[in-house]
Structures are given as structure tokens and as C-alpha cells.
């Protein structure tokens, strides 16, 4: 049986032996969101595996990161003949040292490395000499049970691991 958010609120208050005056809905919401975030940091759940693709532009070292990305599984490059190679993750400082002059056309080649630039952009180096497909496998950030209607809102965790969600919220 799946826990709805309403069920979870009731169970937390019952275990804590407090009513809504002692443990408000907003406080429970924060507790539950923190619990969910800890679960998702420590456990990669197959239900949240996602795949995305991006295409590089010759002479441009940046690509857009998929929204909702939480944890990278792998990043692959596919060339025009269908050959697949894994890109290695490096720190952005390494990429800056690897290619000191990104505008130099003589240094353009098939990318080997990627690094985070910010929440929406990655760098790849060497700077691509042509268009390549970048396949990204990752775990997405699930929607919190607290964001829905309390009487009907459920999540994968509240359906298949309701004890984990409840006891995590009580700790």
C-alpha cells in the first residue's frame, strides 16, 4: 500500500505524539523534503534513470545540461560513423590547462573530456572539430511528495519504501 502525503503527515504526528499545533504542516514538509534528498543522495533508484542527447557545434566547447540532472552515470560521444567513446569527467581547471587557446582551429579534435561549468552548461575538450552526438545517462531529481495534493500525492519511495520515508523523517 502506498503512502500518500496525507498518510505520511498523520504517521509522523502519531509517532511524535504531536498535533498540528506542535508539528506544523510546513515543518513536516521541510523534514520530508530533507529525508527525500538524503535518500536520493545515498541511493540511485533505477526508476529515476534518464537518458538524453546533445549535439556539439564545431568550434564551440559548451553543451547544455539536461534539466533535473542529479547524478551522472556516464557520458558518451558518438561520431559520424557511429563509433562510441566514453568521455572522462575532469575538473574545469584541468580543461582550461588542457586547451589554453580554445579559439585555435588547429587544436580542434574529437572531445575526450567533459567538466561542469555551471548548473546548465558543460565544457568538452578538445573543442569539437565537427558535430558529435553526446549521450548522457543520469539519475534525475524526482518530484517531492510534498509538492502534490496531500490526499493523493505519492512517489516511488512512498509506494515501494514507505517505511524508509517514514523512519527517515522521524530521525
Where are these regions (language model features)?
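Glycine-enriched, solvent-exposed interface loops adjoining structured elements
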Residues: 1-171
Amino acid at each position: 500500500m502506498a503512502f500518500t502525503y496525507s498518510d505520511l503527515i498523520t504517521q509522523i504526528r502519531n509517532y511524535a505524539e504531536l498535533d498540528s499545533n506542535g508539528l506544523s504542516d510546513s515543518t513536516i514538509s521541510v523534514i520530508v523534503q530533507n529525508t527525500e534528498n538524503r535518500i536520493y543522495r545515498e541511493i540511485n533508484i533505477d526508476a529515476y534513470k534518464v537518458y538524453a542527447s546533445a549535439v556539439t557545434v564545431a568550434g564551440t566547447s559548451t553543451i547544455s545540461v539536461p534539466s533535473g540532472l542529479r547524478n551522472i552515470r556516464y557520458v558518451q560521444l558518438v561520431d559520424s560513423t557511429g563509433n562510441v567513446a566514453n568521455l572522462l569527467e575532469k575538473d574545469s581547471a584541468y580543461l582550461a590547462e588542457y586547451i589554453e587557446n580554445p579559439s585555435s582551429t588547429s587544436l580542434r579534435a574529437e572531445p575526450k573530456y567533459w567538466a561542469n561549468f555551471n548548473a546548465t552548461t558543460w565544457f568538452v575538450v578538445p573543442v569539437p572539430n565537427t558535430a558529435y552526438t553526446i549521450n548522457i545517462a543520469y539519475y534525475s531529481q524526482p518530484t517531492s511528495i510534498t509538492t502534490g495534493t496531500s490526499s493523493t500525492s505519492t512517489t516511488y519511495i512512498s509506494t515501494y519504501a514507505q517505511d524508509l520515508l517514514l523512519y527517515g523523517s522521524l530521525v
